[in-house]
Structure formats: structure tokens, C-alpha cells
């Protein structure tokens, strides 16, 4: 299987997001990398499902609450920017203050 660098990166985000989901299900708090991966995956999959940029910017802010992440992670993640492909082209989705307080 020959994957491009972009495809490899997308797969790594997906795997990290799956790990984060399993840890949340066990009641564990997420670290920085897990939180970013989970929110990033939400945006990528939402774009794949045909959702609008504005809708994804809002819904991504509801993926995680402050009580689901380790102490300080909410302040470390000020903005997440994800370049994703929509039916009408590639766009940069910016999610400000992505962890719900």
C-alpha cells in the first residue's frame, strides 16, 4: 500500500482519536495530543459528511468539556486549525477555544 504523507497523517489522527474515545469511555481525562486529535477528527469526518464550515466550527467546540481533559489542557489548546477537503475544495477550518468550559 502506497500512501502519501497527507494520507499517513490523516490515518495517525484517526488512530489517536480512536484511542482518545476509548480512554474517555473508561472515564480517563485526555491529554493535549488526545484532545487535539479528537477535535481534529470531528472536523475531518464532518467535512466528509458534507457539513458546512460554520457548522463544524461551532460543533467542534462541543466535542470536549473542560472536565474531560487533564488540568491545563483547556488553556493550552487556544485554537485548532484543520485543512480539510470539502466538495467545493480544500478549506482551513479554525476552531477557537475548542474545549467547552
UniProtKB/Swiss-Prot annotation:
One of its GO terms (biological process) is urea catabolic process. It is found in: Cytoplasm. Its EC number is 3.5.1.5. It catalyses: urea + 2 H2O + H(+) = hydrogencarbonate + 2 NH4(+). SUPFAM superfamilies: Urease, gamma-subunit. It is an enzyme of class 3 (hydrolase). Keywords: Cytoplasm, Hydrolase. One of its GO terms (molecular function) is nickel cation binding. The keyword Cytoplasm applies. InterPro entries: Urease_gamma, Urease_gamma/gamma-beta_su, Urease_gamma_sf, Urease_subunit. NCBIfam families: PRK13241.1, urease_gam. Heterotrimer of UreA (gamma), UreB (beta) and UreC (alpha) subunits. Three heterotrimers associate to form the active enzyme. Belongs to the urease gamma subunit family. This is Urease subunit gamma. It comes from Ureaplasma urealyticum serovar 10 (strain ATCC 33699 / Western).
